Structures are given as C-alpha cells and as structure tokens.
From Swiss-Prot:
Species the sequence originates in: Mus musculus (Mouse)
Source organism superkingdom: Eukaryota
Name of this chain's protein: Synaptotagmin-like protein 3
PANTHER family (UniProt xref): BITESIZE, ISOFORM I
Function: May act as Rab effector protein and play a role in vesicle trafficking. Binds phospholipids in the presence of calcium ions.
Residues in RabBD domain copies: 4-123
C-alpha cells in the first residue's frame, strides 16, 4: 500500500537537507554517466580504428585491428575466440593468470562491461526478460518535486508466506505491478518456502519408526507404535513415492561422521575355541547405501514369506564380539514371481539400532531358492548391552534396478539367549516370518549410552561459628555434572544427529532446576563435554532428589524435537519401563554423594 509523503509538512531546514542530499546524489549519477560515456567512446574509437576504408588499398591478409600485413609463414596471426577475427601478436591482450588472450577490441569491451556493470543487467535481462529498468527513490523524488509537492513512495513488500496454493497465486497477482529485481527475489523466496514446508512434512513422515517383534508363537506381544508428527497422515503409497525425492535432497553431500564405537567393522580375530560352525565363515561388513535406507523407510516390495534360515550365534567374552554365522536358507519365495527369479542375501541389525553403521549383510546369491552363504557377521558390543538388544536377521531379494523385495525375517531377543551353553552355539533352523507392526513391551529398550562425570562440592568448613549453628553451610553445596558424550544412539537415516542434552534436578520440595547443553550437528557419536552446575543444594537434599538426563535430536523446519533416550539418578532412579536400572542408578547416585569433592565417572544406559 502506497504512503503519501508531503514535503510541505517538513520544516524549511529539513526540506533543504533532503533536497541537498538528493541533488548530491544526482551529481554523483551524472559523474558516473560521464565516466561510462568516456569508456564507451574509447571502445568505439578502437572499433573505428580497425574498420577498413573504401579509399585505401589493403593486402589480402592483414590484422583486423591495426591493418598490419600478415605473412605466410612468419607472423601469420591468430584468430580471436571472441570476435573470430585474425589479429597480429601486438594486438593481443593476455588475461590475468591464464594463457587465454583476446584482441584489443574484445578485451576493451569486456572491461567496459565490468566497469560499468552492464554484465549484471545483461544477465538479468537474459534470466528475466520482462523486468524493466530499475529506478532509484532519489530520482523519483526529484522528478516529482519539480512537478508536485506530494510524493507517492512505495515501501518494499515483505516476502509472502502462505499455506495454500490458492493464496500463493493471489499473492503473486498482487505483486505483478512491481518491476525490477524485487519481483524475481520474491518469486524465488515463495517457491523455496513452499517447497521447504512440503519437504519437511514428507521427511518427518519418513522418520516414523516401526518396532519389530521377536517371532515366538508362545509369547504374548504388545502393541506400541510411534506416530508421525506431521499435520497430515500419509499412506504407504505416497510414502514410497516421496522417499526418492527426500533422499535426493538430503543426500547430495555425503555426511562425514565417525564410526560407532559400539558397533565396529574391524574386530579382533575370534577365539580359537569356537566351534566348527564359525571356523569356516567369512566376515563381511556393509557400507552405507541409499537402498538399505529406503528399506528401513518402508520403500520395498513384499513377497509371500516362506522358507527357513539356518544360522548360529556366538559371543566371545575376551574380544567382546558377537558373531552370527549365516549358513543357508531353503524354500525361499520368488522375489520376482513373473520371472521366477530370486537373488537372495541376508541383512542383520542389533535393534534398536537401525543405522547404517549397525548394518551387516552377506553377498548376493544369484538365481537360487536354496542359497548357501557360509559367512560370519561380527558386532563389537559390550556384555552389559546384550540384555537390551534384539538380533534381527532378514532375507532380501535384489531385483532389477536395485529394487529390494522382503522375503522374511527372524528376531531373537538376546536377553533370553544362553551364551554359556555350548549347544546354543550350534546352527539352528528358524522359520521366516513376515514383518510385524508390534514389539514386546517387557524387553527393556537400549537407546545408547551417556558418559558423565559428577561431583558434589562442599565447603571445607564454616568461617564463623554462627554459620554452622544456623545451617548455612549445608545449603552452600554445589552439584557439578560434566556431560562427556554419547554413543550408540538411534541415528537418522543418513547416519547423523543434531543432538543435545537436557538436565532436570527435582528437589524434595518439587522444585525443578533445568539446564541444557549446546547442539552438536551432524554427529552420530556426539562429544559435548559440557558442564551443568546446580547451586544451593545440600547433601541431605540430594539424597531425596532425582536427576533426569534426556538426550534429544533437534528437528528441522520448526518441528518437534525427537527424544532419543533418558536416564535417571537419585531416589527415584531407573527409566520408565525398565525397573532393573533403578538399583544401579541408586548405587551410582550414592557413590557421588558419599565421596564429596571427588569426581565420579559413570556410564548411563539410555532407555
């Protein structure tokens, strides 16, 4: 909307100052126009100098600039790449820091465009043919002041931001009368913001996780599913269609992140006491692949699940390595029923970690329903984490154009596995099952580990006898907590996280002290090394208090942050749904309070 500006409303001194500035601007513009005119006249002079006159006689071969005769063998001249004229060696100008050259006219024409800024207007005219010439506010004021005292000034329009396509098109029609560079910028900003909102909704739908179930017909299973946080729900068909676009937008630059310290590819050699099942196996790790990322997002085909798979499990305490020997499969379904074709391979995960670092897979066996792999897949995992992990062994078909087809899976809770039993290391046959939408609620979920250091700082002694009598010494305590880092977190599909830590100390009077660490972006194993300090607490208060630490993944485009895991210390220790961790957290909290002014290192399991 235009605003009316009346110069007569200003005082005489103010009006003189405004006009003086405008006239000075007009003087600068006239000086600039004179400089541009001289540059163009010099360029025109060079062109006239090289033009041939009808009153003079020229040889057949001569320089197009200085009209000097050119020889047949020596001083033959060369053709300019800009104007395609043959010029002599003296009429060439070499460009700075390059071996390329131009003739004097082409070089001067290039300089004129650079010094006058014509290259910008040429590029703008080429990209935006309908854009008009830019007019400055000073020129408009001077022209209108000479005619009328009232001036109409149009302020710059803020960038539009609308939800629906209809409102976006109407906004573009309102901006149609504006000319110049502002129109192109606003159109570009509108398209970018609209696309970003669509991309954020689709990407957030892709990150919804589906927890899988251990296939045991004698056990009762629960139902828990993490819902998407977008405004509208999408079906499986639209999810499959939007996945390649999202991967193309978010994986143009391959993120560089350190390998997972819990799950490593390079493991020490296994113990010689292994059974013969593991002696002949080959270790085969997997790399980051977009196709595996798509399968975790649900972008795959399903076949009629049939058949069985034979594998064995062994854990080496000395090297802290879990070994899965994939033997063979039988009676698999066809990955491509029409072509009667099946190219199977096996892929494993240690749930809940579905990242690319936690993936292991075998080689692909071509054209067989009864493949034999004889490969050993290894994980580097601590013994304390085995009770909270589930082994997922799935069989896939590699189709045309790297299309994956799901052939079946087996999920085994490692908490129920007896690694000390020698008979448990023998290879067993397991029936393949279809993908389930549920998971067992009675199995504690391990979402990684959080390394912290804690210290209770208490004064050495009271400075005055009155302080000890009044109890001021007990209230001057300080709880210091250093969040070192985390590992084995449930990362995104690209293998990275934008993680941060929140801390909440709940005192006996229900007062809550909250702190937060900075965000570390694009790191799978973040190392914050950030200090949390809680002042004005006593040892007696902390014995009845609870410290809760939560790790979060910062969302993009203003969506809700994703909770990665939590750990509790104190009188009400233990994460929700994991009662076994309560006694351990209370013991660690007691160690901190019983050793004041000393650092205590702890590794907290996130649930």
């Amino acid at each position: 909307m235009a605003h009316e500006v009346d110069l007569e409303s200003f005082k005489e001194l103010e009006r003189d100052i405004i006009l003086r500035v405008l006239y000075r601007d007009q003087t600068v513009q006239s000086t600039e126009e004179e400089r541009v005119r001289k540059l163009k006249s010099h360029l025109q002079h060079l062109r006239w100098k090289g033009a041939k006159s009808s009153s003079q006689e020229y040889k057949e071969k001569c320089c197009a600039r200085c009209q000097r005769a050119l020889g047949l063998l020596l001083n033959r001249g060369a053709v300019c790449q800009g104007c395609s004229h043959r010029v002599c060696s003296e009429c060439r100008v070499f460009l700075r820091r390059t071996r390329a050259w131009k003739c004097t006219v082409c070089f001067e024409d290039r300089n004129v465009k650079i010094k006058t800024g014509e290259w910008f207007f040429e590029e703008r005219a080429r990209k935006f043919p309908t854009a008009g010439r830019r007019e400055t506010a000073g020129a408009k004021l001077l022209q209108s002041y000479q005619r009328l005292s009232k001036i109409s000034v149009v302020p710059p329009t803020p960038p539009p931001f609308s939800e629906s396509q209809c409102s976006s098109s109407s906004r573009l029609q309102e901006l149609g009368h504006f000319r110049g560079f502002n129109k192109s910028v606003e159109n570009l900003f509108l398209s970018v913001t609209t696309q970003m909102r669509k991309l954020s909704k689709s990407q957030n739908d892709m990150t919804s996780e589906k927890h899988l179930l251990a296939m045991d017909p004698r056990q009762c299973v629960g139902h828990t599913e993490r819902r998407s946080q977008s405004d509208t729900a999408v079906n499986v068909t639209s999810r499959k269609a939007s996945t390649p676009d999202i991967l193309k937008a978010f994986h143009q630059e391959d993120p560089k992140h350190p390998p997972d310290p819990v799950l490593k590819q390079d493991t020490p050699p296994s113990s010689p006491t292994h059974s013969a099942v593991f002696s002949g196996g080959l270790r085969h790790g997997s790399l980051i692949s977009i196709n595996s990322t798509c399968t975790e997002m649900g972008n795959f085909d399903n076949a009629n699940v049939t058949g069985e798979i034979e594998f064995a499990i062994h854990y080496c305490v000395k090297s802290c390595s879990l070994e899965i020997c994939i033997k063979t499969c039988k009676n698999l379904a066809y990955g491509e029923e029409k072509k009667r074709k099946c190219n199977p391979y096996v892929k494993t995960y240690l749930l809940p970690d579905r990242s690319s670092q936690g993936k292991r897979k075998t080689r692909v066996q071509k054209n067989t329903l009864d493949p034999t792999f004889e490969e050993t897949l290894k994980y580097q995992v601590d013994p304390g984490q085995l009770m909270t992990r589930r082994l997922q062994v799935s069989v896939w078909h590699l189709g045309t154009l790297a299309r994956r087809v799901f052939l079946g899976e087996v999920i085994l809770p490692l908490a129920m596995w007896d690694f000390k039993d020698s008979t448990a290391q023998n290879a067993r046959w397991y029936p393949l099952r279809a993908k389930a939408e549920k998971y067992e609620e009675n199995i504690p979920q391990n979402n990684g580990e959080l390394a912290v250091r804690a210290k209770l700082v208490l004064p050495a002694g009271p400075r005055k006898p009155q302080e000890a009598q009044e109890g001021q010494l007990a209230l001057n305590g300080q709880l210091c907590l250093v969040v070192l880092g985390a590992k084995n977190l449930p990362v995104r599909s690209d293998g990275t996280l934008n993680s941060f830590v929140k801390g909440c100390l709940t005192l006996p009077n229900q007062q809550k002290l909250r702190v937060k660490s900075p965000v570390l972006k694009k790191q799978a194993c973040p190392q914050w090394k950030h200090s949390f300090v809680f002042n004005g607490v006593s040892s007696s208060q902390l014995r009845q208090s609870t410290l809760e630490l939560t790790v979060w993944d910062q969302a993009i485009f203003g969506m809700n942050d994703r909770l990665l895991g939590e750990a509790r210390l104190g009188s009400k220790g233990g994460a929700a749904g994991c009662p076994d961790s309560g006694s351990q957290s209370k013991l660690q909290w007691h160690r901190v309070l019983s050793s004041p002014n000393l650092w205590t290192d702890m590794t907290l399991v996130l649930h």
